[in-house]
Amino acid sequence: MGFFSFIQEIAMDLGTANTIIISDDKIVVDEPSVVALDRRTDKMIAVGEKAKMMYEKTHDNIRTIRPLRDGVIADFTACEQMMRGLIKMVHTGSRLFSPSLRMVIGLPSSSTEVELRAVRDSAEHADGRDVYLIFEPMAAAIGIGIDVEAPEGNMIVDIGGGSTEIAVISLGGIVSNNSIRTAGDDLTADIQEYMSRQHNVKVSERMAERIKIHVGSALTDLGDEAPEDFIVHGPNRITALPMEVPVCYQEIAHCLDKTVAKIENAVLSALENTPPELYADIVKNGIWLSGGGALLRGLDKRLQDKINIPFHIAEDPLHSVAKGAGIALKNVDRFSFLMR
């Protein structure tokens, strides 16, 4: 990227929980999808990790917002500000002019025309000149290294923060898909509710997320891979006195069971709608898991035991969509039929 470069290409996975930006084949931004705004002026105070540090800790003059809910934009203005702030992180080095942006953005395959328009408008207001949109399961498949143009069926299950995208891909198109608004945020909410009900301890969204990372599991028996208990500190829900509660992975597996079952059922539903020839390919190739939810301990084994088809976790599940979007952007002519 030179001194007089007028066009910069960036690929973005605009996620409910995290936003990832790739430029020049490198991950240049990997930040929480959070923005902090001044209530009086609506000016941005912080974005990404800095804004997340303020989350649930602000006074009346600052509001912290997660602009996306269930994989789609819930607050248009905040999303535009967040995108601007995150894109600014990409502009490093000295240039005479701010470059025009050529962008491709990954979105849920269930997005309505209105939701697609909202993302495109946000990107254009954040200085995007050419804005392409690609559905997340297709981007994830490209990022994993699947030949999406091949005449064979591959199934992708992309579990993000706000939505789970399940798609059967063949010949460069999505043959059948199932998108549910049950994903990582629901697992976090389950843990918050469980800690309050079972242990009488109030935990924040951030603490529930830490519990999920340290002892989250889809199975009650992880064998040798079992994590150590996690100590949770928080106020008693009734007395407000400080508490210290050890939490084990087995109890978290029980509390996440219903949400994981919804994901299982969504995968089964997508398989039911898959043509027999493609179904045979999927049984042979296995099903690919991507997104942050793919990192939940034991999820691949639980799904495999339930569905009797091998499940593979992508090599870099958190970045599969962004990497695939980056490859699509570098090969726009080849992949133009995948983009909107």
Predicted ranges, named:
Residues 1-159, 167-287, 294-340:
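Nucleotide/phosphate-binding catalytic cleft detector across ATP-hydrolyzing
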